[in-house]
């Protein structure tokens, strides 16, 4: 372990000049395909952030205390309880160890590289004095139960005292003979740091690499993370393990830089770049070309035992900078070269990504490779490192960026959507059916990019997509991908019917929803709302409160399809409405329709009839711009409900007319006024500037005129309306 570590910025990423961070926007899948230096079981450590090595060991150290206490605990938080237990047991051995451990932790807190302030000379001197005493106490331990812990304490104390040569000797004579444990691994990590401080960088980096300690190797090789540095390490030892790390970093820096530019498109037009940006771009490409020349030199000299790694790196770099033909030639060349097993894995993954950009991509070859990668990714998931396993991350980038982009550019949206389904099905490892969902508290069929992609489609597009899933596919790759996406008829009929319902096409919605059984809706995450919300109640009159635990499956029971029942009732009322002449029956029917349909809109309390989720704080998806007269995020049901209330507001019946106008005034299509907050003499208050062209303003104006111009007593709900009171003051 190296005491001082800093966050490093590659010369390829020149901060403000490039402005790109490929991890700074949604859904990039910017996972590094080029990983050759970490051991397979530590891929997840390399893929995660640099502190994962410490976190990984910390969890295993805490396990010692969990075993001692017989329950889950953490020494940092449960120290007093552990001490009390040791006292109860009369366990002097553990109590003595805890005392020394606390002393070391106190010293470590002072010199820790993450401390807010650097320690003073006096604090450093005092820390070394304490560590000399700590070392002596640990050295005098005569027991066996805590021997690994005391051995680790000795090496930690030496590390603080800068006794690096002593740590080298202690490990080689004593520490290395300890049985395998987390404490032995931590001792070896300190040994590697000692090797580095005594001039044995090569051996130190080999250990850091084997352990997956990216933070330490990053510090140890900080001066070599460019082509010139790679060339120097290669000249010293053509087969140095450090080269795997450095080549990885170079290739991945290229990938991250290009991904960042793909977001901002800064490099597409050099005329848009300032002088610094242009300089950065040219420096970047000069480094890329220098790296390619170095690869050619390495392979030509024949000194490396892993030419496959080098040429694969060349191909990945060429691919990232847009030299697709050169990248394909590199992959053809690499296929004939030898390399370690890890390099072979990386070659196959990189080759797959490059294949996706080839107009003549072999579908059968891609199928073969994707099947191999899928099986590898499954093992990642089963290992428990489902989001950090190398092959899992590789399949994300190959499938969701490489192949998905290919089919998007071809206009093949069936394959583009199905690839997301293929990946999601791989992760969740269950079929897309609501029966399967019953084993969980949450139905994953309604989350994830695959569902979100389907949810953006129109009803007609969903119909087409579902038909495409069902038809035979002759292309072997397309056949495998499409068939991996479960085409549950209940799921898709509900999706399509719900889309039509949201569009206000009630009859078409019913034709699909009538195919879906009632029990299906018990498996929806919105089952509670569907079962317990009443769309006959006026949203502007009644607030339907819910219990706390309302989200997830099996929160409601159904004897009939709730969406179909809604559609059938609306269709029946619409038939009555169409046949009725202007008069009370027509207006009452219009009011019922306006009430029901508004409840099913995004602003209603029965919104799960027309959608599967809703953002908190979002009252209404539709908005009317009174200045332009245009709609944005059009909500067909909300607009339809308004038209029915406008009709019922024509009624001569005072109560019906007032209720209709009150409902219109409630609808949040726009705001009747702009509110401005003021603060004066310790008091806060609002003033309102009316938007006289807004729909809500017009509704409030009509409501006000109606109740003021009538001899009928004003209903209490109108009298108490705060919004109407403000309207009367500021109109």
Predicted regions and their residues:
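N-terminal secretory signal peptides that target proteins for export/translocation
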Residues: 1-3
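Hydrophobic alpha-helical segments, especially transmembrane helices
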Residues: 5-6, 20
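Sec-dependent N-terminal signal peptides
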Residues: 6-15
